[in-house]
Each structure stands twice: as structure tokens, then as C-alpha cells.
Amino acid sequence: MLNGLTRVSTSSELESILDIVQSSGEIAVVFTSPSIGDLETIASETQRRQLRIAGIPRGGYTILPAIPLYDDELLQMCERYTAANEYEKAEMRNSLYMREYPLFAYSMRHQRALFHPADYVSRILQFCSYYVQAPDADVLSLQDRSPFLHISPIKEICTQLRLIARGTPVAASDSESPVPEQLRLHAESDVEKLAAERATAMSIAASSGGASETEQLSLFSGVAPSALFQKDAVEEVNKDAEDTMEDLTGEETVDAVHSFQAEYLTLDGFELVTKASIFYDREGEGQCIVAVYIPGGVPEDTCRAAAAVLEPAATKKNLRAPTNGGLPPDTGIVGYYDYLTNPTQHKCRETEFSRRNWGLLAQSEPLLKHLDKLYSQLAPMHHHLQRVAIPSQYQLCGTVFSTITVNRNFRTAVHTDRGDFRSGLGVLSVINGEFEGCHLAIKRLKKAFQLKVGDVLLFDTSLEHGNTEVVNPEIHWQRTSVVCYLRTGLMSSVCEMERRKHLNRLILEQLLNTEVRNTTVNINGADSSLPPLFVPTRLASHLAPVQLAALGFIVERTEKQSGCVVAMTMGLGKTLVALTLCFSQLYLAPQADILILTPKPIISHWVDEKNKWGMHGLHFPHFVASDGLNSLEFEQQLLEYERQKNNEKPKSGHIFVINGEYLAGFLRRFKRFTPLVMIVDEGHRVAAKGNKLTESLDRLRCNLRIVLSGTPLQNDASELYRLVGWVNKGVSRVLPPKRFQELANDINQFVEGDDGAFYNAVVAQEYIQDWMRGFVFREMENDLPPLHDYLLICGSSDVQREYEEKLGLTETAMTALKATEHRPHHLSTHPACYLAFISDSYQSMVSGWTVRALSNTSRQRVSQLEEIDTMRLEQYVQLVENEQLDAFIDLSGKMRVLVDIVLRVQARKEKLIVFSLYVGSQDLIHRTLTALRVCTFTVRGRDSQDRRRRAMQEFSENKDLIVLVLSTKIAAYGLDFTAANHVVLFDSWWNPQVDAQAIARAYRRNQRKPVTVYRLISATENKFVLRSQTRKIALFKCILHERTSRQALPDELEDCAANEKDEERRNFWAKLKMTSLAGDTRALLNVYRYQESVRESE
């Protein structure tokens, strides 16, 4: 007995009947009897086999096969089928045989199917089509004759589509005999009983560690609101949240002061501007507005009405003393602010003054509207970009302003405004007072602007500015001014996620005590100011908070006809974000086309993700991918699209996933191709100068350009500038390339070790971050398990040192050599690898560990070797053939360290990936580990997508497969190897993002264990790679992580082997340091934490 339920024994006769239904696809009618069993027995066994049961005919039950489609799939098919003509219906029926049915395969895993699931689906579609168009009299009689009308979801789908088609629900006619009451109750009670039993079974399974909550949910029984989103994707609110929210008045930081002592300006040296004027930055390329002066721009009565409600916001509780000679001035913040550095629950919200005075603030709306109109007329490009960037939730009175700084009797010292949107302008106006002087002076322009009540100044708040002296200050003077602007912190990923959680809570409150039965849900539906964002209901709970936030960020930009960059750390699920966006766009515009451009190796990853999430409702009628696995099917899909473009068939939306090499040919074939959205995966490729790919994409008329990249900045800051400029062409018109390069140079100077450039680097860093925030969604952090990342400096054997000296691998020589022909890399792998590479006999050596007869060309290369070298090469082969593996391994520090790491991982029954850039190194590693009887698999750049897919599956499922050896630059993209929690970078590339991509194969979503990364660095060539990497990482942190960083100096790196907190790992480092190579050199010289190679400055 379990919760009042008992296991009912099943008769052999009932089992035979159910076997026939399950294997043949035919229906069967049964009646309760001693040989069959009672209703409970029939219902229990039918449910166990996932078959369906209907309460007809009278006194009996009809058993039907399991429906081989998800509810939303079936609904979509029925919708299309009932609306199609006879020719289109025939095509749809034929297409049913070309698709896969994962639900059917699962339900038949213990049975041999004697029918095709397409036959059953075709019957359902035909019935639904007839039902939708049938006369009422026929519909009523169908209740007695069709079991389809007694099982979900077919009965709900038929009823819904008939209601849509005819506009009236099905009702009993007086002229027709009603459905017998006893039969109606009989059928309904069966459905209710089965539903209740199913829910009870789910509860039991859950309590006993059965299927997960999301697996148990189905639209058959509806989705409970509590299960619609992940728990951490919904805002937590205390009952007394309104009263307990922290008062952070005065905690706002809006100034950047440039000196320790306040600098006050006088009118001396400045030209006083009293007439309407526009000023441009002529130092840049083209004309970029930096200031617009409008005397009398706002009526005085409008100003004074606003002053009456805004002036009380200005108090002495603030952090602006440095711009007021050391004493707090009267100032305050109205509207919204981003309290990102405060330890508060709500980071992005209205200020305390605003929260308590929203009703009164309506009196300032005419002022804000007036300033907004002037802004749009006189600086239209800045205004447009600010309109695109501002989240609708933070718009004050529908303007492009999120925040107002109110100053009362405040003569500011020289400063710049911190946190303002740099693609926009600040709008300053004096709204009350009686005074003389106190002009606003901008040092760079050498202009001072006379500001009286009603005067307006639009200006670049990143320029140093301050007020001149007050005339006759001994006489009582009053002056109230406001600066209206957009706070960029409100567009941060923190604020986006916070806002998303708030919206999710509102949605759940609206759905309280109901079930979500629709196949899709508009997750923006709780806020009418937001564009719709439709997500499959079953998918919503699989979207992490950061993914939901990214989606919200994207659709707000696309609604305003702007693109954006989605910069998320590798492994956070950018592909799912993009596919969900495609679903929403096609839901709203079913005939639109979408282009996804991605590197060829990643196309199969997109297909796999589409198939994976299709099981959760993410379906696309036409998903055309050129993955090379089925070129015939790809061509057929293109021909189908061609017929639609030529109006030979009705148009339906397509998603094209193609690689850059095929793009030109695709566009030649479809000259009128105009996608609604263009998504570029690994989008940093469009940032390269003179890129032909970018030229091809620019020929497409598409404003909605979405760039996906975990590494939007690869080598220098100018890449990011070109990237943002590509998704929104207007950006370069407000920040000329020359000005951006000046900022980037300031950062580079500090990154490369000039501590004297720190201040300029901070200023440049903040400017670039504020400039890009409206167009770049950044989430560089994650909630994954811990990552332990180490630099292991490996020693060299005596043979390696000998060849290093022969090659002249000193530091100065290495700089000139630049790894010519990769010889230093082969030498650091193993002397055998180096000698074989030189002699061109390597392929034979690694294949059979024997030396073959050399060709004439090879003999010429062998002439580079001395006789001792040839003897050594043969000796190394003999070591392996004689199974003297330790002697062979001890000839290389990196190989010795790698082997010991592998054996440690194997002993822990864990898995490891080894990444290497070079084929020779990959092969030698594979052969060495195989000789040690470590089960190893290798995936090279030349391997097919199918082999890579099989490797992923084998690595995940085969417990004996311990090590994967992968090509860094090819296999590092589009693969998920979270079965491994150890990663070895056997060699490193000049671009650190290549290594980061490799690590992300294991350190990504779905990883449940801490991940350890071992970066093997030789004492020769890899030092220079490391220096290049750390410079670029420091730059990356400055720009995207908002951390002012620089390369660590050699004497700043501290060996962490002795103070390693993990005892087992500490002992392992000690063992490696005691291990000797050939020639009595230590295998491991130093251990450093990789993150310490870049130093962050406070």
C-alpha cells in the first residue's frame, strides 16, 4: 500500500489487447469483465504504457495509441492543416513521413512498431479538419462516434479551432438528440479520474526521486504558475517591502573629480556665449556636436512650476563635497538610479525622494517634455541613440531621460559627470532663482554659457566643466538648475536581470490560481510599455535569469529598429537565447525570414540545439541549415524557398543557418532576400578591417543586427568599436573613430605597464563603458561551480636544453624567431616530436613507432640533422617499442607533467580534455597515453562533424573513456564536453580568447563539478605567448569587466604551490616539483594562479 494505492494485477487478456494497440496502432474497445479486469485495472495499465483511453462506447472503453507529438506541435499542425487547400494538405501528409518522432520512439522502446507514427498523425489531422468545418448536427453526433473527442489535447484543439473558424462555440441543438447524460458523465468521469491518477503518480515519482518537475509538466494538465520560471528567475518580495526598502538618499555618485583639490573657474580665459549656438568637436573626424545653447528655450512659468516640486529634492545629504570645496552642497537625484555598488536587494530603482513624491512629480512633466523636444530637434542623432538605449521602465514621462540632478545654490568645481550615456547629451536648464554670473564653462571649448531661468544647454558631460564665479555673492542669491540625462547603469546586466525577475513576478501574480494552458506565453505581457516577447510555455522554466534578461534587452532594441551585441561568457547559452528570439519574431511575423551566420564547425551545434529544445516547444516550420551532412535535403529546402519567393506557393517564414563562405553564393541565388533579423554567431569576425564578410552583410537591407560573442574583444579595443558601429551605424557619428582610438590608447598604455597612465586609463575606461552600454548586453560572470586555473611552468630535459641552445632560443632570439615553422612548440612537446618534424618522418613514427625510408625531399631535410640526431630519433622509437615509457616521457617536462595529471584524473575516476594547436603534438599525446593504456580519443580539425558528434556522445556515455585530445582552434567551438572537469592547455595561442573558448567546452552550463585548468608553459617559447595573452586579458577586463587592469610584473607573481588550500592538490604540486626529468631537471618549476597574471587596480 502506497498513499492508498495498490498495484493492480493485470490479466493476460488485457495485456494482449494493449500489446496489439501499442504495436499495430489500431484502436481497441474493451469492457470490464473478470477476464479483462475492472476500470481501475484498465486505466492503470493503459496509463503505464502511455496509451490513451476514452469513455465510449456506452459501458465500455476505447484504447488508443499514444499521440506521437507534443501538444503544441499537434496544435500547430492542426492549425496549418485546417487552413490549407487539398494540394497543401497532401504535401503536409507526405512531409509527416520525413520527420522524426522522439516521443514515439520512447513509447515504443520495448515494442516493435508495425506502423508508422505519421499514419496516426494523419488520421488526427484529417479528423480535426473535418470537425472544424462540420455542421453542428454532425458535430453533436461525433460525440458518440469518435474517441478523439474524449481525449486531450485533441478535443481541446478541435474545439478551439472550430471556435476560431466559426466564431461560435459548439452548442446542443433543440432539433437534435442531446448526448445521453449518462454517457456524458461516464466519459467526463473517466478523464477526470485518469488526470487525478496521473497527478498522484507524478507526486509519488517526485517524492521517490523520479522524474524532475519540468519533465512531469505537460500541457495535458496545464503548467502551474510556480513552475513557469526557474525559482531564481522570479523576484523575491517581502510583505512589507515598500516600508523596508533602504533609503539610499545621498549614496548616488554622479561626479568624477580630476584633482585632489577643487578647481574653480572664473570667466577669465573664457568667451561668454549669450546667443543661440551649436558647437562641434572639430578635432574628430567629421562634425560631432558637443554643445547646443538655447537661451529662453523653456517658458519661465513651466520652469517655476517644476521648481516647486523638484527643489525639495536638493539636500545636503550627498557625496558631492569634492565639487563644492569640501562641504556638501544642496543637491539631489530625482527619477531612477543604479545603486550597483550598494549591498541592497534592489539595485536599480527610483530614488527615495521620487518614490515618496511620484504624485507631485507630474507637475514637472511639461518641463521634461519641453526639454526632450528641444533635444530631438537640435541633436537628433544623439536623441535617437538615447531613445534606442533607454529601457522603457526607466523613462521619465515618456522622454529619453531616466534621471534628473537638481542643484540649488551650487557653484560646481571642475568635474565630469560620471555614469551618463556617452552616445547622448546631458540637458541642463536653470528653472528658478535670482543671481548674476555662475555661468557654465566648458574648458575644452573655452566657452562659458550664460544661463538664466529658462535657458537650456545640451552638452557632452564627459568634458570637464564647472561654474564661474557668482557676481556679488555677498548679496543673497538663489539658483536652481536641473540636468536631465540617462544613467547607463540602468542598462547593465544586473538591472536587466532585476527587471526581468520583477516582470516574471508580475506575470505569476496575474496567473495566480490558474494553469497556463497556452502553448506560448508573452513574458513581457505584464508591462504594456514593453514589446511582446513570446516564449514556448514549456521552455520558460529552462531559461536562466541571464538568458531572460538578454532576451529582454534584445527585443527592446529590435522594437526600436536597432541591433545590439550580446556579450555573454562562453557556456551561458547564447544559442538558446538566439533561437528563442527567432521563435518570438516568427510568432509575430510568420512569413518573415531570419538569417543566422555562423562558422561552419558550429552549424551542427545550432541544429543540435534546435532539436534539443524542440522537445520543449521551440519549433520552426522551416529551419534550413547548411551543415554539409545532408546536402540533398538542403538543396530541396532551398528549392522550396525559391518556389515561395516566386509566388508559386504560399510564403512561410524560414530560418537560414549558413556559414560565411556560402553567404555570397546564397545572396547571388536569392537577390531579393531581405531578412527581418540577422544574427551573427562568433560575431567578432565582423570587426576585422576590410572584411569581405562584412561587405556582403552590409548589402542586405536589415537594421536588426544581432551579434553573439563570448569574446567581442579579441586583440584591441578598436574591434569593439567596429562591432558596435556595425549593429548601429549612428554610433560612429557621435563618437568619431579618432576620438575612440585616443581613449583606447590611454587604456593600452596602462595595460602594458605604464602606471603613470592610470588616471587617463580610468577616465577612458569609464567613457567607453558608458558609451557602449546602450548597445552591448554584457554578462561576463556566471553562477557555475568554481574554476581553478593554473599556470604550470614546466622544466626542460637536458636534450631539450641542448636543442634550445642550438636554436638560440634566448628571449631576444625568440622575439625575432616568432616560432618559425612551429619548431619551438614541437621541441617543447618532446625532442622526438621536434626531430621527426625536421626529418619529415613524424607521420610514420606516430603511426607505427617505426622510421620509414625517406623520400628525396625528406632526405634533404634530414641533412639538417646531425648523425647523433638521427640516432636519437631511432632511440626514442625503440624506447616506446620496448615499453620503456617513463624514460621516453622524462625527455619532456610538459609531457611528464601531462602524464602525471592524466594518471591523477584517472585515479579520481574523472575525465579530462587536452587541447593542442599542433597536429604533431596531438598525435604524440594520443600515442603516449594509449601506450600507457589510458583510454583516449582524438578529434582533429579535419574530422567531420559526424565524428565530432560521436566523440561527444561517446565521451559522455563511456565511463572508460578518460581523455579527449582536441584541436584548440577547431574543436574549441560548438562542442559541449561537460563530462570532463579537467582541462589541459598543452600549448597556448597569442589570442587568449581562443584558449577561453577551449576551456568553455567543459566550463559551461550543465557543468556540476568544479573545473581545474592546467596551462602548461615551457621555459622558452610560451613565455612570449603568455605576455601577449596577459596584455589582451587586461584590456578585455578593462573594457568588458569594468576593472582597470594591467599585466602583472614578473616579480609580482607568487608561486602558489606551497600555500595551495586544497591539500590533495598541494601534495600533487609538491610531487611534480620533486619529479626529475632526463638530466636531473625538475619537471615542474613553478605554479601560478592564472588570474594573478593580470593585476586589477583599485
Swiss-Prot record:
Q: Which residues bind Fe cation?
A: 415, 417, 465
Q: Which residues form a coiled coil?
A: none
Question: Positions of the region DNA Helicase?
Answer: 541-1098
Chief location: nucleus
The GO terms this record gives for MF are: ATP binding; ATP hydrolysis activity; DNA binding; DNA translocase activity; ferrous iron binding; helicase activity; thymine dioxygenase activity
The record's comment on protein family reads:
In the C-terminal section; belongs to the SNF2/RAD54 helicase family. In the N-terminal section; belongs to the TET family. JBP2 subfamily.
Please report the name of this protein according to its UniProt entry: Bifunctional helicase and thymine dioxygenase JBP2
Species of origin reads Leishmania major
| Taxonomy of the source species | Eukaryota, Discoba, Euglenozoa, Kinetoplastea, Metakinetoplastina
